[in-house]
Amino acid sequence: MSMQDNSEDLIVRNALLRGDAQARDLFMSNGKYVSSEEDLSASCIRELDAGGKLCIPSFIDPHIHLDKAHTIVSAKSNRSGTLAEAIKIGLELKRNYTSDDLVKRAGQTIVAAVSNGVTHLRTHVDVDNVGGLLPLKAILKARNIYSDIVDLQIVAFPQEGLLKNMGTVDLMWKAMEQGADVVGGMPFSEDSTEESTRHIQIVFE
């Protein structure tokens, strides 16, 4: 028996589900799990053999920085080992960002994540007066390119501060208008407790 010739249908044969001792055949349609049987007699255009390996829901990575991925190859050494120096080094790198390089590095990271079972990512992307909206636009482009294999949520992230880094508040509004999903914050980056408090207030406005 054959199922309808739907290119979105998939049968994964010989897959072990958590808690089961016997491998099963799994039927998926339109990207969603439908049913399983120990020996599914139907056939499908697309079939995979899991080889008796465990089949579980994919993983979620809720905190990643795709705009900074793979920058270690060109970054200076963090001799102090502190967050402050790491941010300073990142700031220097940011001045030389290009859209093509950002998309390439983000893509490498997305493919690596998916190949290891991660299909949902939340990425923070710097928004400030150094890189402007270039990193955001590049990551939005990467999200579109890889939308068939990963769900990517984008956080507009004011790492250099909202008050300390002039113009960032306006850039954050523009980032949300252009496709960022979440407003991020980093009150630590401000110069005083009062400014950190105001930073938090702005994020929730």
Regions found by a protein language model. Give the residues of each.
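Active-site gating loops and adjacent loop-to-helix segments of metal-dependent hydrolytic enzymes
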Residues: 69-102, 179, 203-205
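Active-site metal-binding motif and surrounding structural segment of the metallo-beta-lactamase
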Residues: 39-56
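Di-metal (Zn2+ and/or Mg2+/Mn2+) metal-binding site signature of metallo-dependent hydrolases
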Residues: 53-75
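Divalent metal-coordination and catalytic microenvironments
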Residues: 15, 31, 52, 63, ...
